[in-house]
Amino acid sequence: MECNLVNLSNDNVGAAQLNPLIFSAKQKLSILHDIVRWQLAKRRAGTHKTKGISDVSGTTAKPYGQKRTGRARQGSLRSPQFRGGGIIFGPVVRSHTYSLNKKVRKFGLKIALSLKYLNNQVIILDNLNIDVKKTSEMCKCIKNFKFSSFLIVGDYGDDLLRAAKNLHYVDLIKPIGLNVFDILNHECVMLTKDTLKHLEGRLL
């Protein structure tokens, strides 16, 4: 598979070879759904917590005698039926992470890249070595491409990161950090030639 190789000014500088095992994978959207759920679950802090009957402040004494009052028997004023009492079965601090097979995660990355390539939303860059230091300069480069949001994957420098940091529709990540959620969350995915080599070593 061959596609155009361009620079950040959208000038054609050659051709790039794409591996069909990565960019022509069979589409299984259910796997993408599973991986996105897995990624979002891992991101959750899990710091939610309510106070149970043993956590709330209050006396431990029995409020009144078991018999002779005519009222329902009570053993504690910290019970959930009283004002200021504990919460039963409330959320506790826990991890929402669960495991997902490595083969499924690899296959999901192939599916996501193939889906973008199928919709002509993958751009191959020669490199990210460009003299851009200001956000306004980065805007001019990005306007050469007719997409609403961009995920740029490659070994970028501090100047490029600083220039793109304030653009809400542009995200830069290293090749090792490429993931399904970020691919699907951006309209256009920009990959460098070195990133293609990294993906072949990672996914094949």
Swiss-Prot record:
GO biological process, one term: translation
Coiled-coil stretches noted in the UniProt entry, renumbered to this chain: none
GO-annotated cellular components: ribonucleoprotein complex; ribosome
Record bears the keyword Cell inner membrane: no
An example Gene Ontology molecular-function term: structural constituent of ribosome
Region of interest called Disordered, as start-end residue ranges on this chain: 49-76
InterPro entries: Ribosomal_uL4, Ribosomal_uL4-like, Ribosomal_uL4_dom_sf
UniProt keyword terms in alphabetical order: Ribonucleoprotein, Ribosomal protein, RNA-binding, rRNA-binding
Disulfide bonds: none
Family label: Belongs to the universal ribosomal protein uL4 family.
Assembly: Part of the 50S ribosomal subunit.
Role summary: One of the primary rRNA binding proteins, this protein initially binds near the 5'-end of the 23S rRNA. It is important during the early stages of 50S assembly. It makes multiple contacts with different domains of the 23S rRNA in the assembled 50S subunit and ribosome.
NCBIfam families, sorted: rplD_bact
Protein's name according to its UniProt entry: Large ribosomal subunit protein uL4
Organism: Wolbachia pipientis wMel
